[in-house]
Design a protein with these regions (language model features):
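An N-terminal amphipathic alpha-helical segment
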Residues: 1-64
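Ser/Thr-rich, low-complexity intrinsically disordered terminal regions
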Residues: 32, 92-104
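Acidic, low-complexity, intrinsically disordered interaction modules
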Residues: 43-93
Length: 104
C-alpha cells in the first residue's frame, strides 16, 4: 500500500478528517474541531501533547469515527484505515477527544 501525503498544517488535518468522514457517510459533515498540540497544552491538557492533532468528537458528527462507545465499529475502523494511508493513526483518549499520531 502506497502512503498518501500527510497533512502539513492544522487546516490540512481538519480537511483530511472531514474528507474521510464524508467519504464514509456519503454526506457533507461538519468541520471537525481540532487543536494543535501547542493549543492543547495552552488549555492545560495533559494527554495527547506528542500527537500531530487533537480531535474533539463530543456531541458531533465525529463521535462514531473516534469513540467505540457509539457502537459504530465500521466507521471507527474506516477512519483508522484511511488515516493509515496517510501514515497516521489515532488513539481515543476519552469519550470526547482523540489524538492523531504519525506511524513510526
Amino acid at each position: 500500500m502506497k502512503t498518501k501525503i500527510m497533512p502539513k498544517s492544522h487546516l490540512g488535518f481538519n480537511q483530511l478528517i472531514e474528507d474521510i468522514a464524508g467519504q464514509y457517510s456519503g454526506d457533507k459533515v461538519e468541520t471537525p474541531i481540532t487543536y494543535t498540540p501547542a493549543q492543547w497544552k495552552a488549555r492545560g491538557e495533559q494527554y495527547g501533547l506528542k500527537s500531530e492533532c487533537i480531535v474533539i468528537h463530543d456531541g458531533g458528527d465525529y463521535g462514531p469515527f473516534f469513540d467505540l462507545d457509539h457502537g459504530h465499529y465500521e466507521a471507527h475502523d474506516f477512519m483508522q484505515e484511511e488515516l493509515a494511508k496517510h501514515g497516521l493513526w489515532f488513539e481515543t483518549c476519552t469519550t470526547w477527544y482523540s489524538a492523531i499520531y504519525k506511524n513510526d
